């Protein structure tokens, strides 16, 4: 049986428990355990890139990690992946900071990683590449004679042509993506956006619904909405509360709790969310003294100016809202800029009456799914969810809102706070059914199954070389 080789920017080391490593690690480890294989990625450390790979083997899985030099980390990761691709793919061209040296570094590191992986590959390996850090990776492997089946999954949104084509190197990136055999996206909108971008660049021939030829390469596109481990989350949420949390729950027994958690990022719509909560307090004064909104937003990429700006903005807004609406004995908004243990968050989800998840743009947003999975089915909370989160395509029984419309979000919060138990149970059951069906294992099994069905390029190379491509005609 073919091995599975997984390549991602970071790897979850074997001594890190899967539950604490997050959803992606759970899915990848499940796929690797089923097939056996290799997980290849950055160690998270800087140092001499010429050092041998660090390898750890446990069971039928090998972890191979490498260091990056300070320059390569800065150019490949900070200045291109996170300062160009991340904002552009989240529709924030105003935050893109394109620099040619960073682009050169991005290509250089992808080539370097291909060189490091090449000696580890076997002829029948199936290769699965993850996320925007590694868009050119298949292209680099093909240049080195690798004809194995190579799949790619994009965890973040793919932008429309008006956005993507503004990147100075958009054409090169699109051509490089065609070197994958299978391109997986979170939503149908993302898949179609990629094909629209490609069609603007060159002629795309669609042989069947999702099989295409462009730039002289044949490839498939498909949608694979990533899932979670609902049973594990329910188990974590239902366990006994730590003493401090139990005390807090007792103190707030007569208060309805609105809860949000995500890392501090401009794509999450936190300033807009604070203003929507203010609109709730203004338009629905009957809730004064009876609700509390808690926002947990641990710092991420704190050295980037855009992230520093949003942190200061949120701190100012939280103080202003509390100063305007707070009363003796009641603070309407708690903003916590710190990290909390994931298991503890599942317990907080369970006793929260409303889960507020309103990103301005998100590939999927697993927090929305985790909130649903953590609820008590007999007395569940209500999910208020942005229409621009990939999860909105599946969790249609949530209260779907436009995060840019503060009045709509405020009205949804009021509805959630006053919703009957029967309606809450019905909505939760419908969403939980979807989450259980499309869990993390279903996600990885579908992707790997589809990738295995593709004929390796070594068997099709002569036929593909005969495919003519033409530029897009005006």
Curated annotation (Swiss-Prot):
Keywords: Glycosyltransferase, Transferase. InterPro entries: Glyco_trans_20, Trehalose_OtsA. The record marks 86, 156 as: Involved in alpha anomer selectivity. GO terms for biological process: trehalose biosynthetic process. It is an enzyme of class 2 (transferase). D-glucose 6-phosphate binds at residues 10, 77, 131, 301. Pathway: Glycan biosynthesis; trehalose biosynthesis. GO terms for molecular function: alpha,alpha-trehalose-phosphate synthase (UDP-forming) activity. Pfam families: Glyco_transf_20. Its EC number is 2.4.1.15. Belongs to the glycosyltransferase 20 family. Probably involved in the osmoprotection via the biosynthesis of trehalose. Catalyzes the transfer of glucose from UDP-alpha-D-glucose (UDP-Glc) to D-glucose 6-phosphate (Glc-6-P) to form trehalose-6-phosphate. Acts with retention of the anomeric configuration of the UDP-sugar donor. This is Trehalose-6-phosphate synthase. The lineage of its organism: Bacteria, Pseudomonadati, Pseudomonadota, Gammaproteobacteria, Enterobacterales. The gene is otsA.
